[in-house]
């Protein structure tokens, strides 16, 4: 009987420890657009403290947009990623620091050969604190680029999750042409510059 009591006591302690660990997590969401969402997703999936990355669309006029519509540039939606992260491990400031590294925020509605409003540089803030942090980050990083930053800073609109085949795209298609020549170099750049932020 004593052994049974000790067993249940131990199991109870383990559950409490798991609950305490979960409660100590400080989850936040960052929503960012900076060119093709495959690129941002691939990098943030390699970032420590990031719990989930979801590709999607935001900022446009069409409800429940499809990729075919967005890619034509007629919905006003941007390709974005929603990054869920534990702010106890990686801060919103650090998320933005990575964001500036892996895309060019000085080119209007364009990233490399990807051209159109759907590829615009944009930060959608979820609260006033994020807005303030983003404003400070834009001011700081403006000194690090030759041309002015054209990144939009806007309140978070409705987010529409992209089609399933767009999720974990680089992970599932590492040898696809665009992934090899565009996505992979961004991932390697991130790992080389911000080694302390890599999982």
Can you say where each PLM-predicted feature lies in the sequence?
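Low-complexity, intrinsically disordered regions enriched in charged/polar residues
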Residues: 1, 10, 181-184
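Flexible coil/turn and secondary-structure edge motifs
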Residues: 18-199
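Bacterial N-terminal signal peptides
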Residues: 3-15
């Amino acid at each position: 009987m004593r052994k049974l009591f000790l067993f249940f006591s131990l199991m109870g302690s383990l559950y409490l420890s798991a609950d305490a660990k979960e409660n100590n997590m400080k989850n936040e969401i960052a929503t960012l657009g900076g060119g093709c969402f495959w690129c941002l997703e691939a990098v943030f999936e390699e970032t420590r403290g990031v719990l989930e990355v979801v590709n999607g669309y935001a900022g446009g006029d069409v409800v429940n947009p499809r990729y075919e519509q967005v890619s034509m540039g007629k919905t006003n939606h941007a390709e974005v990623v929603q990054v869920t992260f534990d702010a106890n491990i990686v801060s919103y400031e650090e998320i933005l620091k990575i964001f500036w590294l892996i895309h060019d925020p000085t080119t209007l509605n364009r990233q490399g050969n990807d051209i159109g409003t759907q590829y615009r540089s944009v930060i959608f803030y979820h609260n006033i604190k994020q807005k303030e942090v983003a404003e400070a980050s834009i001011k700081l990083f403006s000194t690090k680029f030759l041309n002015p930053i054209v990144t939009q800073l806007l309140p978070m609109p409705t987010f529409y999750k992209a089609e399933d085949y767009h999720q974990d795209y680089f992970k599932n298609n590492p040898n696809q042409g665009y992934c090899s020549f565009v996505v992979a170099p961004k991932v390697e750049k991130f790992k080389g510059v911000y080694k302390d932020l890599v999982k």
